[in-house]
Amino acid sequence: MDAFKLLTRATKLKTGATPSSAQSSTRLPSTGKAENPQLFRNSEAEKVLEQAQQGKKRKRTAAAEARDADDDAAELNFFGARKAAVSSTPTSKEEKQEQERSGEDDASDEEVEFMDEVQRRTVLNAHKIKVTDLRDLEEIQPVRVASEEPKKKKKKRKQQEEEESKVPLTKKEQKKARRLYPEPLVSFKELRSKYKISSRLAENIAEQGFTVPTEVQLGTLPLLLGGFESKAGESVEPDLLVVAPTGSGKTLSFLIPVINKIVRHHHDQSQEQERGIFSIIVAPTKELASQIVNEGRKLVHGTGVKIALMKKGMRVVEREDEDDDGDDSSSEDGDESSESEHEERPIAKKSKGKAPVTKSDILVTTPLQLVNALSTNQTKPMATLPLVRNIVLDEADVLLDPLFRDQTLNIWRACTHPELRASLWSATMGSNVEDLAKSTIKERKEAVNQTKSYPLLRLVVGLKDSAIPNIEHKLIYAATEQGKLLGLRQLLHPTAASASDVRLRPPFLIFTQTIPRAVALHSELRYDIPTEAGGSSRIAVLHSDLSDGQRSEIMKNFRKGEIWILVTTDLLARGVDFRGINGVVNYDIPNSAAVYVHRVGRTGRAGREGGIAVTYYTKEDIPYVKSIANIIDVSEKLRGKTGEKSIQKWLLDALPDLSKKDKKELKKHGVKARQSNLKSDKDDKEHRKTRISTKSGFERRIENKKKALIAANRNRKSQAQSAADGDSGNESWDGLEN
């Protein structure tokens, strides 16, 4: 008997409307993956996709239909006996062979039907996917004439030149000429039937549970798997620039085509041909590179493709000038050699040779590690990578920023294969990155004497440089540093207040501007979680000053759920995929709008609803907040949020605009009051205001006195010890006294 039903039978409460069910209806990112990972969709596009799927069905044999019926029954019978699942699998060799044969028939005999242009437009526009050809108009226009008006080929050249010179295209016509509507991907099953990817790769994708493609996968996978037709009518792989929201599946989008291309290459090449690095994936941080390798290993299982993470001491290319240096190394001192050379010397003595060159097909690396490997720690000219046919820049806007630009371009230029294809991926990409990519591709084309022309396409999902619309944004004024600390503690220990208050459940990330501030905030919060819940072990800090082992251990514990709150810098702001994070706290405002987009993108991954992004700002931050407020406003409009907005119009009007000079200064150094290298007395006073601590000045003075006394005592002891050692050394032995 339900006591709640019995007590509320005279009320108007609906059945099942219990408090527990009301609370459970609020879905969080940590509760599991979303039913549909797509961010943008409507009923018209879904109808078109359903029609496309129905049009591709073909007649199946009776045995195949019976086998499918058995599989469906086994899947739907969640509470059935274990024997049902075992009986559905083939037991004899003949049944297994027939199943493999039928699987091949499904891929080869299935009638492939393509959408018409109206259907393609409907689907791409509904999912807010925009594909643009970035080549010069002189290269685009002949393609249009050849494909749309084949009858006009018979005209004379002079008449065609006159017609083209008479009417110059307007900006609107130029945009229309550049706009493309390629075939979208309806489901992951099409990868095998329509694009003929490896059967083993298709099985690995299915085992990971991928069924519905996200917007970026829906648009990019057909292009990268040969779905773009060139001027001659043949399918080619274009150079691609992709701008897609955080957590939308960009890693899977570039891994599948790269792996499939290598599988085909291994199948076509002779066994005698030497294997080497076929594709390079460059990422800005070690955490992101390690994550890409982990995802890649799941996809390459059983395909014969090897993926490796770049490490110190790894040799990626055979250099001709290494032999001469190897002979002289025994006579020279080894102080100037790198860590990799130290690791290789014992091997060289034992086996009379060097460490073997890596045979991995895909190499995932950070820029500096690969540059050091190719240039012997920048002591020799860069070696070339003639076998590399794909270079992928993940988080391309950072890799082509001044910090990594020279290293990234050196790697790009070292790939000398004439058929090299480049793809750049990020959630934020400025026009300067596009211009740099275009100029680099053009420069390579001239350097390699490339005769064949490849298209350069840009694919944008949603609004460019905007935050994901499936999370809630909160911009909170805290006035002072103590106000921010108080607000953060209220998140950790929520009280029974109004429903409008922010409630954030662990796990979540806290971002700070600098490493000292992250360490100070961690030491301030480490005892805020009671010992019954795990105490200080539930809070950790992660930054670049930690060793690689410490960083990987913290990441592992955070993914396992042993750490609930992770205080970090912008080290984890990009690319790292924590699927169950319920929210992000910007304790310090980000240095730019792009950094805000990437920070808040750590939650709401793969379409998960319920994520929260909280940003605290103080009086010192007011000049820099408007760009963040604009992003939040655009995100809410994109979401279609009704009712009261978190960013009011009066706030947008009141916040001051930031000049270009101030934007550059903020991007380089952050808010001046929080910089750790302040020197003047005036700046030091501002720095004291932004100190993360709840200790009073009196307590801090006592601590400083204790530290000074301890340091003075140590100095006095060391001086006395050194004086005693000096006196004993100066004394001479006069012999034994009588």
UniProtKB/Swiss-Prot annotation:
Residues 487-655 form the Helicase C-terminal domain. A motif (DEAD box) lies at residues 394-397. A motif (Q motif) lies at residues 190-218. GO terms for cellular component: cytosol; nucleolus. GO terms for molecular function: ATP binding; ATP hydrolysis activity; RNA binding; RNA helicase activity. Residues 231-447 form the Helicase ATP-binding domain. It is found in: Nucleus, Nucleolus. It catalyses: ATP + H2O = ADP + phosphate + H(+). Its EC number is 3.6.4.13. Residues 319-338 have a biased composition (Acidic residues). ATP-dependent RNA helicase involved in 40S ribosomal subunit biogenesis. Required for the processing and cleavage of 35S pre-rRNA at sites A0, A1, and A2, leading to mature 18S rRNA. Interacts with the U3 snoRNA and is associated with the 90S and 40S pre-ribosomes. This is ATP-dependent RNA helicase rok1. It comes from Aspergillus clavatus (strain ATCC 1007 / CBS 513.65 / DSM 816 / NCTC 3887 / NRRL 1 / QM 1276 / 107). The lineage of its organism: Eukaryota, Fungi, Dikarya, Ascomycota, Pezizomycotina.
